Curated annotation (Swiss-Prot):
Its main location: membrane. Transmembrane segments: none annotated. It is a peripheral membrane protein. It comes from Vanderwaltozyma polyspora (strain ATCC 22028 / DSM 70294 / BCRC 21397 / CBS 2163 / NBRC 10782 / NRRL Y-8283 / UCD 57-17). One of its GO terms (cellular component) is vacuole-isolation membrane contact site. Residues 57-106 form a coiled coil. This is Autophagy-related protein 16.
Length: 123
């Protein structure tokens, strides 16, 4: 009976040991293990400076984006104005072509009439 009791106590100790291992406090590690406060402070300072750099970079990129948007709007406006100008010039070309055709027909008719008149005078 004593051996059974000792065996049971050993099993209980083993179970308690495993149980304690399950609920050990977990130490949070950021990068390499930080053992003292000076390392933590250095890390905080480094992270803050990195954050400031990233904020500056964000500002620069926002400025670049604003400039590109302005350039895009300017180009879009110019494209619209050039399209309008192109349409106006196309209309003018069409009108001038029609007018030229009418003038050529009138001139040809006049020349034909003059030629016919000269032919009649010869006969």
């Amino acid at each position: 009976m004593d051996s059974l009791f000792v065996e049971r106590l050993a099993q209980r100790d083993e179970v308690e040991g495993r149980f304690c291992e399950l609920f050990k406090e977990v130490q949070i590690m950021v990068g390499p293990q930080l053992e003292d406060e000076s390392m933590e402070r250095k890390l905080i300072v480094a992270l803050k400076s990195d954050l400031v750099e990233k904020d500056l970079r964000i500002g620069e990129l926002e400025e670049i984006l604003q400039l590109r948007n302005k350039d895009y709007e300017r180009l879009n406006d110019e494209l619209i104005s050039l399209n309008i100008e192109n349409n106006i010039l196309r209309d003018k070309l069409q009108n001038m072509t029609e007018e030229n055709s009418k003038l050529v027909k009138r001139w040809l008719n006049k020349v034909q009439q003059e030629a016919d008149a000269m032919n009649e005078n010869l006969h």
